[in-house]
C-alpha cells in the first residue's frame, strides 16, 4: 500500500520517527484500521481483571503492592493509547508541525545549527531506542520470573469469577495470553514516554537556535528584520510548548500521582520482603519507575532553564548605549517574554503572549 504524504513526512522525520513507526505499526496514529483494537481491547480487558484481583487479594500486603504495580502500569498504557487514538488528529497535526520546523532548521546554512540539530536528534533517537530495549528487557523479566519462583504463578495477577486460574488447561492458556499481550502492552506504554522526551528535546533545539541567533547579532550587527525574525521564532517556541502541554498535561498528572504512590509502596515493600529474588524484582520495578520519571522531568527541567537563559543571552548581545529606541524595545520584548519560563506542567497553564 503506498504511503500518504502525512505518513512520509512523519515516518521520515528523524527526531520522532522511532516512536511514530511503533504507533504506525499498531495503527494508533497516521494509519487508522482495526489493528489498533487487537492491542487496546485485549490489554484493556486484562487490566480490568488485574484490578479485580486487587479486590480479591486485599489484606495480603505483598501481593497487593506487586499486583497494583502491574495494574497501574497497564492502566496508564491503556489510558495513553486511548487518548492517542481519540485525539489522533491533534497529535498528527502537532507531529506535522515538528516535521515542518525540523525541515526548516535543516535548511539553515549554519554549521552550529546543523551540529545542534544532529546532536539532539541522535540523543532523542538513542533515548527512544533505549527505552524500547529497556521496556522489552523488563517485560521479559515480568513474564519469565514466575517460571523460576516455584509453584504455579501468572506474570500478572488476575481474577475471573468462577474460574480456577491454576488448573489445567486454564493456567497454560492464561499464561500464554499474558506473554503475548505483554508485547503490545509495552508498545502502548513506552513510545509515549519517548515521544514526550523527544518533543522536549526538539523544544530545546528551537530554544538554543534562538540563543545562537542572538549571539550572532553581536558579530553581524543589530538589524530590525533579524530581530523581528527572532521574535517570531520565540513566539513559535512558546506556541509549540503550549501545544505540547495540551497533549500531555493530564497524562503527566496521572503518571505523577500513580507512580508517586507506587514508588512509596514499593520502597515500603523492600523493608518487609524476605527472599532475595523478590528483592531483585522489586528493585527492577523501582528502577523502571525512576527511569520514567527521569525521562519526563529531567528534559522538562532542561527546557525550562534554557528558555530562561534566552533573556541573559539577549541582554549580553545588545550594545545598549549605541542602539536606537526601536531596537531596544524589540530586545526588551524578547527579555520580558523569557522571564516566564517554558514549562511542561501537570496542570493547565496560560500561554505566554
Segments (PLM) and residue ranges:
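Helix-loop-helix junctions within predominantly alpha-helical proteins
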Residues: 1-68, 99-200, 205-229, 250, ...
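Short intracellular "coupling" helices and adjacent cytoplasmic loop segments at the cytosolic face
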Residues: 81-86, 91, 103-107, 213-227, ...
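Short amphipathic alpha-helical coupling elements at transmembrane boundaries
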Residues: 93-103, 205, 209-216, 228-243, ...
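C-terminal transmembrane module of eukaryotic multi-pass membrane proteins
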Residues: 195, 272-275, 279-353
Amino acid at each position: 500500500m503506498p504511503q500518504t504524504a502525512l505518513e512520509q513526512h512523519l515516518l521520515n522525520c528523524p527526531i520522532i520517527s522511532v516512536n511514530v513507526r511503533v504507533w504506525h505499526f499498531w495503527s494508533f496514529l497516521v494509519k487508522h484500521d482495526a489493528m489498533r483494537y487487537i492491542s487496546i481491547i485485549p490489554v484493556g480487558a486484562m487490566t480490568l481483571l488485574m484490578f479485580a484481583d486487587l479486590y480479591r487479594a486485599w489484606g495480603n500486603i505483598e501481593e497487593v503492592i506487586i499486583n497494583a504495580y502491574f495494574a497501574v502500569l497497564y492502566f496508564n498504557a491503556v489510558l495513553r493509547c486511548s487518548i492517542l487514538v481519540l485525539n489522533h488528529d491533534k497529535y498528527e497535526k502537532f507531529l506535522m508541525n515538528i516535521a515542518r520546523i525540523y525541515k526548516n532548521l535543516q535548511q539553515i546554512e549554519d554549521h552550529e545549527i546543523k551540529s545542534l540539530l544532529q546532536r539532539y536528534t541522535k540523543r532523542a533517537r538513542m533515548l527512544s531506542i533505549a527505552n524500547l530495549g529497556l521496556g522489552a528487557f523488563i517485560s521479559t523479566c515480568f513474564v519469565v520470573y514466575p517460571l523460576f519462583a516455584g509453584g504455579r504463578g501468572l506474570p500478572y495477577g488476575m481474577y475471573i469469577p468462577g474460574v480456577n486460574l491454576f488448573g489445567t488447561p486454564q493456567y497454560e492458556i492464561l499464561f500464554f495470553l499474558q506473554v503475548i499481550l505483554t508485547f503490545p502492552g509495552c508498545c502502548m506504554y513506552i513510545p509515549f514516554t519517548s515521544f514526550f522526551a523527544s518533543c522536549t528535546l526538539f523544544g530545546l533545539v528551537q530554544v538554543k537556535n534562538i540563543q545562537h541567533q542572538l549571539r550572532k547579532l553581536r558579530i553581524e550587527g543589530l538589524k530590525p528584520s533579524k530581530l523581528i525574525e527572532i521574535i517570531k521564532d520565540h513566539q513559535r517556541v512558546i506556541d509549540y510548548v503550549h501545544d505540547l502541554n495540551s497533549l500531555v498535561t493530564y497524562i503527566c498528572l496521572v503518571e505523577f500521582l500513580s507512580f508517586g504512590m507506587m514508588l512509596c509502596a514499593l520502597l515500603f515493600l523492600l523493608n518487609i520482603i524476605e527472599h532475595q529474588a523478590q528483592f531483585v524484582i522489586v528493585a527492577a520495578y523501582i528502577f523502571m519507575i525512576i527511569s520514567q520519571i527521569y525521562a519526563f522531568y529531567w528534559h522538562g527541567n532542561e527546557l525550562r532553564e534554557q528558555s530562561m537563559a534566552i533573556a541573559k543571552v539577549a541582554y549580553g548581545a545588545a550594545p545598549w548605549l549605541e542602539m536606537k529606541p526601536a531596537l531596544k524595545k524589540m530586545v526588551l520584548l524578547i527579555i520580558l517574554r523569557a522571564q516566564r519560563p517554558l514549562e511542561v506542567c501537570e496542570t493547565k497553564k496560560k500561554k505566554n503572549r
